[in-house]
């Protein structure tokens, strides 16, 4: 399918895979799962590489999950330079989780992104004091 939220629109397959995808490509369910595992690992590692020691030590499993989801959705470069990561690297975990909710635009305000960010925020703050 053509992801029309992206600018410019980008051919996409499975659960948001875009690298090397051409319109008309077909994948099996097993191939999609394998692609998702590989891409999720790549995005998770990209997020982790943007952390300072303070940011890394501030992680809970829930913060890690929320930021990995955000990174998969908006990209490693966008997350790495974000206020959310800057706050996390400063040890401001709650502020970092709040900043996740700011990513609701994809060229224009995208209604589908608001509930996603709310879910990521709820995951991110789970267990925080």
Question: PLM features: what roles do these ranges have?
Answer:
Residues 58-67, 94-98:
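Alpha-helical scaffolds flanking conserved acidic
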Residues 8-10, 62:
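Extracytoplasmic
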Residues 13, 67-68, 96, 120:
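Residue-level detector of buried hydrophobic side-chain packing
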Residues 1-6, 16:
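Core of compact, soluble alpha-helical bundle domains
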Residues 5-8, 21, 26-38, 44, ...:
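Long, amphipathic alpha-helical surface segments
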Residues 10-13, 17-20:
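A short, structured beta-strand/loop element
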């Amino acid at each position: 399918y053509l992801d029309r939220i992206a600018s410019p629109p980008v051919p996409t397959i499975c659960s948001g895979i875009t690298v090397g995808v051409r319109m008309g490509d077909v994948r099996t369910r097993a191939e999609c799962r394998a692609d998702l595992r590989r891409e999720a690992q790549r995005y998770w590692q990209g997020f982790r590489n943007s952390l300072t020691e303070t940011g890394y030590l501030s992680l809970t499993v829930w913060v890690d999950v929320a930021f990995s989801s955000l990174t998969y959705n908006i990209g490693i470069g966008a997350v790495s330079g974000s206020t959310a990561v800057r706050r996390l690297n400063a040890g401001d975990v709650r502020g970092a989780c709040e900043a996740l909710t700011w990513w609701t635009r994809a060229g224009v305000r995208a209604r589908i992104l608001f509930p996603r960010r709310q879910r990521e925020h709820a995951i991110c703050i789970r267990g925080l004091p």
